Design a protein with these regions (language model features):
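Solvent-exposed alpha-helical segments and adjacent loops
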Residues: 14-745
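N-terminal signal peptide c-region/cleavage motif recognized by signal peptidases
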Residues: 3-4, 10
């Protein structure tokens, strides 16, 4: 029994092993397939590589899945170099995982010619040195003179490797054992940086309970995939050709599992694909649909207990419900958070001179943080660095989302820890011995932020010919640095589709979606299910936790939605029959009929944020072609709750929503109260009655809402002053009267 303040789970591994599994016995008689891969450096998220005397080193990284082995590996470099470099002395060294692979000579270029073509060099690398995570490093050795007096940081020392350079390799599948101790590999591999694509297999269209189990599992895999993204194709009664998940009860097995032993309870099992033997199937089995949900909960909460090939989930219990805003990927709002709590690997907070890399931290904030008239987000930064030996200017620059925030001078006393505190936008002193307090302006804080700290060490020279050897300086951001949002309240104007698209709000206020109702059509299509599973994966990606407590209903089902935020998904005609009577719905789609209500200043992207514009136009038309919409409005069941509808004119058009969810750039365009999506563009509408969710202290609440009505605020201020003046006058009159009375004989 595994217990904590959140959950309890009991898993029985090994003891439960169905008897007849001969058809799925291990063994790989056929030859393992070999596949070829080709990536440009740009596809590996690496732009042009610029090497110089100041920064002679740079690298690219690539990964290898746990179920594959590299058989051949090569790179084809397209590069150019400074014509000042001497051929006999200059070259580029190429390393694979710090093992020297090749020395690439640099051929001289003539000064009196214009060079427009890149040189090309193919290099074979040793595949046996490949690991799960790999680095190819390039080091420039550049000389421009035979003279003993040479400036190694001279601007004429440079070479550039083009982003169209190519990495090629051939890989062969490995025969992995079917063991839960490896899980979630090979279904999800942390060393695979591509989008996770994991098919969900059913015998036929699943019912609501089976759909819920699959959605929970999708959100769990989405949390694992994180920034990679995830999609979950839906397959009916067909054996997949890749790693896949199969959900089946004893009465709803796919044909390829008909002879498989019946489950004796909630069961999780890994087997080899009977036709594609190097692929695996994750079986989620049960006597009924309730068992499927329990099995999925066992994966989400009790995975460390699972070993062997099969696990029978005896019990999953929730000892304490989750609290609001406790999503693992969100910055905690109940206390200050150490930088050490935000890192993904031990050396993330340090960097070395010459590496051309900075310290980066991802910070997600609750989308409804109330930043009105705040002084910003407080950060106490502690850092250390190798002290410079001269007074040459070295700096530490801080940026947020690629926007410069503040710079610090690195003084010669940097061997000790320096605490920096300041307030943006005030300029700070360069005296690093002083305590300084700084804050990130609230308007720069988005749902997802990247804090970047870049140490810039200056080159130390003594005279024209003497330059200190680089590469020895180190900069460290202390893991005891803190960031604190505990003094912020939670209050936000709704509907706000940007908060939904970027943070899943309001549903993700509770990471397990315990106060969310998801409404789906009674006979969902494959694409509707696939969109639901992709959306569930997005919730998991945002919070880092599966949607274990979300409630699922059919759109025509009687349900108490009073205390729920509602998510509607499906074909527009099925959904609008339930919601089109609500006056807050500004977009209506029914087959070829399209209707939209807009404000007078609809073309202004921030018009909605400035005022509640009244409807100025209403357009109703008939048109064909793919169209989908995401619409937000106040819940008709509870004024403090929200409804978000994801709908399409036809079921096939739901792929527009799914593609938008999977595309980070497309998702960032979802804003306002309604978003209309066609094959080429995203259009936002900002019309709708504004309402607020959350809470504020009474005084702040009054002043915040009065600030939207300056004339009323001025009148109330004047009345307040008059009342205070009258009260003070009465007090003074009373005191004067008493003084006169005491002076009389």
């Amino acid at each position: 029994m595994l217990s904590s303040c959140v959950l309890g789970a009991s898993v029985n591994s090994l003891a439960f092993t169905p008897t007849d599994k001969s058809v799925f016995s291990e063994g790989y008689p056929e030859a393992a397939p070999i596949t070829s891969h080709r990536f440009t450096f740009e596809q590996l998220n690496q732009g042009d590589i610029r090497l110089s005397g100041v920064l002679p080193n740079s690298d690219i990284n690539f990964t290898n899945r746990i179920d594959k082995i590299i058989k051949e590996l090569s790179i084809t470099l397209q590069f150019t170099n400074s014509p000042a470099l001497l051929t006999e002395l200059s070259h580029i060294k190429v390393y694979l995982n710090e093992q020297l692979m090749a020395i690439m000579p640099i051929n001289g270029l003539r000064y009196d010619q214009v060079h427009q073509t890149l040189k090309e060099q193919a290099l074979k690398l040793k595949p046996h040195l490949v690991r799960n995570y790999n680095t190819i490093r390039f080091e420039l050795i550049g000389h421009y003179t035979n003279d003993q007096c040479e400036d190694t940081t001279h601007t004429s020392i440079w070479a550039e490797i083009d982003q169209e350079s190519v990495l090629e390799f051939k890989s062969q599948h490995l025969a992995l054992e079917s063991l839960l101790s490896r899980f979630p590999e090979p279904f999800y591999d942390e060393f695979d940086y591509t989008e996770l694509s994991l098919p969900m297999v059913f015998r036929g269209a699943p019912n609501k309970e089976t759909t819920q189990a699959a959605a929970i599992l999708s959100s769990w895999f989405g949390a694992k995939a994180n920034w990679r993204g995830a999609q979950f194709p839906v397959i009916y009664n067909t054996l997949p050709t890749d790693h896949a998940v199969v959900l089946a009860t004893n009465s709803s097995k796919p044909d390829f599992l008909l002879d498989y032993p019946d489950a004796q309870g909630p069961t999780v099992e890994v087997i080899a694909n009977p036709e594609y033997r190097y692929k695996k199937l994750l079986l989620i089995l049960g006597r009924d649909e309730a068992d499927l949900k329990t099995a999925v909960e066992g994966i989400a909460l009790g995975l460390p207990l699972m070993t062997g090939r099969t696990a029978l989930i005896n019990e999953v219990s929730y000892i304490k419900p989750r609290e609001a805003y406790d999503a693992p990927r969100w910055l905690r709002s109940d206390r200050a958070v150490r930088f050490g709590e935000l890192i993904d690997f031990p050396t993330q907070l340090q960097t070395k001179e010459g590496s051309n890399k900075s310290v980066k931290l991802d910070v997600r904030l609750a989308p409804d943080l109330f930043t009105w008239r705040s002084n910003g987000l407080p950060i106490e930064l502690k850092y250390r660095y190798t002290p410079p030996t001269t007074k040459a200017l070295s700096r530490l620059n801080m940026s947020i989302n690629d926007e410069f925030v503040q710079g610090f001078t690195l003084s010669p006393d940097g061997g000790k820890e320096i605490i920096s505190e300041m307030r943006i936008p005030l300029l700070s002193s360069d005296d690093t011995d002083k305590d300084r307090y700084f804050s990130v302006p609230g308007f720069k804080v988005d749902v997802k932020n990247e804090l970047e700290f870049k140490f810039l060490f200056s080159t130390e020279k003594e005279g024209f010919c003497t330059t200190s050897a680089g590469g020895g300086k180190v900069g460290i951001i202390d893991d005891d640095s803190i960031i604190d949002v505990s003094n912020f309240h939670h209050y936000i104007a709704m509907p706000n589709l940007h908060a939904y698209s970027q943070g899943g709000f309001p549903f993700t206020k509770y990471a397990d979606l315990s106060e969310t109702a998801i409404l789906i059509s009674k006979n969902p299509s494959r694409l509707e299910l696939q969109t639901l599973f992709t959306l569930s994966g997005h919730f998991g990606k945002t919070t880092g936790f599966p949607i274990l407590k979300a409630s699922f209903y059919y759109v025509d089902e009687e349900a108490d939605l009073t205390n729920k935020d509602v998510l509607l998904l499906g074909q527009a005609q099925k959904l609008t029959n339930q919601i089109k009577q609500d006056s807050a719905l500004t977009v209506l789609l029914e087959h070829s009929l399209r209707e939209i209500t807009q404000a007078a200043y609809e073309s202004q992207p921030y018009a909605y944020a400035l005022a509640n514009d009244e409807a100025a136009t209403k357009v109703s038309l008939s048109s064909l072609g793919p169209l989908a919409a995401i619409v937000g409005f106040q819940s008709p069941f509870n004024s403090n709750r929200s409804v978000i509808a994801l709908m399409a004119t036809q079921e096939a058009d739901l792929h527009l929503i799914e593609q938008t969810i999977r595309d980070s750039e497309g998702l960032a365009k979802v804003r306002g109260t309604a978003t209309i999506i066609n094959q080429h563009k995203v259009h936002n509408s900002y019309l709708g009655e504004r309402y607020y969710v959350g809470s504020l202290p009474p005084f702040t609440y009054i002043w915040f809402h009065l600030s939207e009505h300056p004339l009323l605020l001025a009148i109330l201020t004047l009345l307040t002053l008059l009342i205070i003046s009258f009260v003070l006058w009465r007090i003074l009159v009373s005191l004067a009267r008493k003084r006169v009375e005491t002076q009389e004989p």
